[in-house]
Amino acid sequence: MAAVVDDKDRVLGVESFHTTRHGYRLMLAWMRSFGDLQRVGIECSGSYGAGLLRYMQAAGIEVLEVTAPDMHDRRRRGKNDHFDAESAAHAAFAERHTATPRSRDGMVESLRVLRVCRKTVVQARRIALQIIQATIVCAPDRLRDPLRQMTRMQLIRTLAAWRPDFTAYREVEDAYRISLKSLARRYLELHDEIADLDDMIEAIVKDLAPELLEQRAIGLNSGAQLLLTAGDNPERLKSEASFAALCGVSPVPASSGKTVRHRLNRGGDRAANSAIHIIAIGRLRLDPRTQGYVAKRIAAGNSKLEAIRSLKRYIAREVFGIIIRRQKQINQSQIAA
């Protein structure tokens, strides 16, 4: 559903289109039939609106992501697709409740897709292991006893190497053997798949920001998550303060009277916040400079949690600087090519 407003924010038309390339082409032609097209506002540009976002950007149209509906208008008029399209058009015209969307045409998008795939494979492997353990608990003693003292991978490889009689599946013990062998082979296949995905993810992270992995306590998973949060176009963030707010580590004032303090920021990308927290805890254990900083903040009257929140803010600043510098290098190399 799409709506068009004029330069006085009056609705000129509302129309429905299919979410296909042909539908996008018809939508763009319909919008341009009203005159010069200034900008387009899209809801859910990271999911259902991703295809439309890519099409509009390829056509050279300025695109804004509409981040939140007009709740006052929704309470007054209710909700349907017609009203939502009008609300998005009004938001794009006024440039309120909008943001520059992440472009989804670079290596960061490849990284995101691979990490989503890896997450589901890890979940499937964990489920397979849980079923193996539950099955062994219920297995006959003659099967269970030799497996008790084995480590996880010893157990999995032992079960995968079993050669049960597949024609005797009606017998209880043989049915257990068949089931455990099948589950163990599944676990090993998923384990190998995770290793392959990790190699691809590591290669992309090293291409995008090799300096990031050289920093203390920044591992592959944390670095990948921070690259995902920044996106393929980190320049859309106006400053490192914007990146800190996006990661949920910007200070939120919670002062009263003569007490000046800041509280936990519960907003932003919680996955990025978790990655920065892991980095902060790692540095607190390994980095003498970080240990000295936290000790200094505690001596000044801050709690340990408040000191860690300040540390997370500095980490966000450091990470953003690395990502932006690398992005400039990539852009310059593309221009030179």
Question: Which ranges hold each PLM region?
Answer:
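A detector of single, family-specific signature residues
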Residues: 1-337
